[in-house]
Amino acid sequence: MHPEKLQAYVLSTLDYGDSDRIVALFTLEHGRIKAFARRARNSRRRFGAALEIFARIEAHVEIKQGGLSGLRQAEIDCIYPGIRGDLGRIAYALYACELVDAMTPEGHPLPRLFRLLAAYLDRLEAYPASEQERRFFEINLLNILGYRPSLEACSRCGTPFDDRGALLLDDGELVCRACTGHGRDMTQVTLGRMLACLKTGTFGLIHFPDEAQAQTGSALDRALAFHAGHRLKSLEFLRQISNENQ
């Protein structure tokens, strides 16, 4: 079997034995896959620095359905030196990769999400990291995967949200006040900004006022925790870095 040449991002790596490595890749052609890289820790000719987390690479992979594929060789397309030189940007890039790793099915192509991750890492390479752009990435990821909260109407009864906005429940669900009397307020301004994020593919165009940013963060944190099913390790690192920079 001849290896396929795939466009890929390195999502995670796991050392195996004395010299091998298991690599999670997010590819344009096959979505998320896991591949076994034999002697990856010893062979700089075949891999070099290409297996660093969030590196964009050309991966030579023998695809195996229902098991570990074989990573034969990898060349770097972009190592993102600007991100790697800044601890804050590293934290956001690691979080984005772990989120994709946790949220996506294996072996299912997701070209829109591949382009979203590419755009986010390109943005982090060129500009300082920000919470607003993290939220832009998150809501578009949820939308692509079919998990985003209903922003126009109550998820229970279907009634369009009025000027009072919505109420946010613990699982990230947004409902009207006729369906529940409990929950965190989500104003129409917040809902409108979240919807605006879905109407442009460009980072840096949508600005969240402080209240809207806080409400958006609460909604996305709850939705992501619910759908990911476990706590992301990189999220703790991201929060630590964010607190130190305040």
From Swiss-Prot:
One of its GO terms (cellular component) is bacterial nucleoid. It comes from the Bacteria. Pfam families: RecO_C, RecO_N. One of its GO terms (biological process) is DNA recombination. Keywords: DNA damage, DNA recombination, DNA repair. InterPro entries: ARFGAP/RecO, DNA_rep/recomb_RecO_N, NA-bd_OB-fold, RecO, RecO_C. The keyword DNA damage applies. Gene3D superfamilies: Nucleic acid-binding proteins, Recombination protein O, C-terminal domain. SUPFAM superfamilies: ArfGap/RecO-like zinc finger (SSF57863), Nucleic acid-binding proteins (SSF50249). NCBIfam families: reco. Belongs to the RecO family. Involved in DNA repair and RecF pathway recombination. PANTHER family: DNA REPAIR PROTEIN RECO. This is DNA repair protein RecO.
